[in-house]
């Protein structure tokens, strides 16, 4: 949906021109390398939050006897929310999020927030909830 090009402005300009020539309908964003890394982390962690949030909705529906798919359809019918990352269980037939990106990026942000003394309780809660509901640990454990 967008190309993010991070690094030295002179070098990035060539890449942006290339991407815009090859993919004229896809906008490009030229930023510093630190900003491009932040964009990746924040984008992935937002989607991890979304997965966790819809798993919470699933828990609520299960506890109250509501049909999750009916509720999900109504909520995701709002174009601001969208349907991606709302299937419970997910495409891997497990709850929560796994894989190589979401767990790594969420934990990296937790560390970066802690190093800067920025409250990250919300990030930690998402991680703890994911560990609680996820049956398959398919990410590297350090």
Model-assigned labels for residue ranges:
Residues 1-84, 112-119, 129:
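Internal alpha-helical scaffold of NAD(P)-dependent oxidoreductase catalytic cores
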Residues 3, 137-142:
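Acidic, glycine/proline-rich low-complexity segments that act as flexible tails and inter-domain linkers
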Residues 68-124, 135-139:
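C-terminal substrate-binding/catalytic lobe of Rossmann-fold NAD(P)-dependent oxidoreductases
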Residues 128-134:
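A short beta-alpha structural unit
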